[in-house]
Amino acid sequence: MALWRGLRAVLAVAGLAVAVQLLRGWLGSKSYVFNREEIARLAKEHSGLDYEVAFSKIITELRKKHPGRILPDEDLQWVFVNAGGWMGSMCLLHASLTEYVLLFGTAVDTSGHSGRYWAEISDTILSGTFRQWKEGSTKSEIFYPGDTIVHEVGEATSVQWSAGTWMVEYGRGFIPSTLGFALADTIFSTQDFLTLFYTVKVYGKALLLETSTHLSELGFF
């Protein structure tokens, strides 16, 4: 019996290792809709403007360049995010299993843990300040409007945003792997299940839009 349990454990670990390698290969070889430089450049062009004006212009530009990829106005919603001890708000524009684009920020001073992801995440600041303290360092660095901060795969940092900080965020990697961190505080701390519902709903809508657009491009519709 003990031998059988041990064999099952070995097979499970081996299966997981194979799945991880296959996923890494897929992420490394697939084509993507967006890229970090494009999003950073677009956000930087509008940094320094009133952030609501900047948001509107950025959404318009993204819809022109990527038709069918950005959620329609009726599905755009600002949703609270509690994670790693900090509190912010996001407005999801695009999401798939491997990419997302969103607007993010906070109306109050807030700080906490960045999370550690199987995804690369970049933020370009439109207004306010972003202070980052990297793991293994004894000093923090502060970023200003127009700056882009890149959070590498597997990296962990301390983050701090001043009130009125707003930015454009792009993530690339295995996006479902980020949801545990993004939703843990909501489930186990704030127990704000309405926010949880909003988050899952908008991500689901984004996945449906991306699937529909992809199938349309392949000629299914």
From Swiss-Prot:
Q: Where is this region: C-terminal hydrophobic region?
A: 174-221
TM region positions: 5-27
Residues marked Important for ligand binding (site):
123, 169
Locate the region Important for ligand-binding. 96-103
- For this UniProt record, give its keywords in alphabetical order, as a comma-separated list: Cytoplasmic vesicle, Endoplasmic reticulum, Lipid transport, Membrane, Nucleus, Receptor, Transmembrane, Transmembrane helix, Transport
Superkingdom, natural source = Eukaryota
Cytoplasmic compartment ranges equal 28-221
Q: Does the keyword Membrane apply?
A: yes
- GO cellular component terms, A-Z: cytoplasmic vesicle; endoplasmic reticulum membrane; membrane; nuclear inner membrane; nuclear outer membrane
Write out the domain note.
Answer: The C-terminal helices form a flat, hydrophobic surface that is probably tightly associated with the cytosolic surface of the endoplasmic reticulum membrane.
Query: What's the subunit arrangement here?
Result: Homotrimer.
Function field: May function in lipid transport from the endoplasmic reticulum and be involved in a wide array of cellular functions probably through regulation of the biogenesis of lipid microdomains at the plasma membrane. May regulate calcium efflux at the endoplasmic reticulum.
Sorted alphabetically, which PANTHER family does this protein's record hold? SIGMA 1-TYPE OPIOID RECEPTOR-RELATED, SIGMA NON-OPIOID INTRACELLULAR RECEPTOR 1
Its recorded name reads: Sigma non-opioid intracellular receptor 1
